[in-house]
């Protein structure tokens, strides 16, 4: 009954919106599992830090489990590098490692979200980066990410149309 109610809500929301973003805490609790169960696709953010990169494998296993057991239509749209400090060797090395380890199977977005004190301040103020610093580098990166995500969405819609015609 709960799953039917969840799917009914999801279907009603899908009629009114092109995209619905569900931002979950970086844990694998029930909220995250329920979000994956309701989702069409997932974008996996990770930081260019050793522990974040290690946690990526665990999250990918969880996504695979949800796909197998609950939501067979779930797909991974990509891995998003966040809080990147491009001038540091560790950011460069871990980003390169993520791309080489996963890039053949899973898209690693071209857009990287840079680390910025302005983003930290926006979060502390309870504002979006666009409301807090719309002309800053983080807002520009998120705008670019939006274009990449829209392109993926358009390709998926075209694929769905082609599948229905067959």
Predicted regions: what they are:
Residues 1, 52-55, 138:
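Short, conserved glycine- and acidic-residue-centered signature motifs
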Residues 1-9:
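Single conserved hydrophobic/aromatic residue that forms the stacking wall/gate
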Residues 6, 59, 142-145:
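Hydrophobic residues within well-ordered alpha-helices
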Residues 8-9, 53, 154:
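A periodicity- and composition-biased signal for non-globular, repetitive helical segments
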Residues 14-114:
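Conserved catalytic-core segment of NTP-binding enzymes
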Residues 70-166:
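C-terminal lobe/tail of nucleotide-utilizing enzymes
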């Amino acid at each position: 009954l709960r799953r039917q109610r969840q799917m009914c809500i999801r279907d009603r929301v899908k009629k009114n919106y092109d995209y619905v973003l569900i931002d979950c805490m970086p844990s694998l609790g029930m909220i995250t599992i329920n979000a994956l169960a309701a989702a069409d696709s997932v974008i996996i953010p990770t930081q260019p830090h050793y522990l974040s990169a290690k946690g990526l494998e665990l999250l990918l296993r969880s996504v695979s489990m949800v796909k197998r057991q609950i939501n067979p239509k779930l797909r991974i749209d990509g891995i998003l590098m966040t809080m990147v400090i491009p001038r540091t060797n560790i950011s460069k090395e871990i980003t390169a490692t993520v791309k080489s380890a996963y890039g053949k199977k899973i898209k690693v977005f071209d857009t990287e979200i840079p680390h910025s004190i302005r983003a930290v301040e926006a979060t502390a103020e309870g504002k979006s980066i666009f409301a807090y610093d719309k002309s800053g580098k983080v807002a520009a990166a998120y705008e670019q990410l939006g274009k990449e995500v829209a392109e993926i969405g358009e390709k998926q819609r075209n694929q769905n149309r082609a599948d229905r015609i067959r």
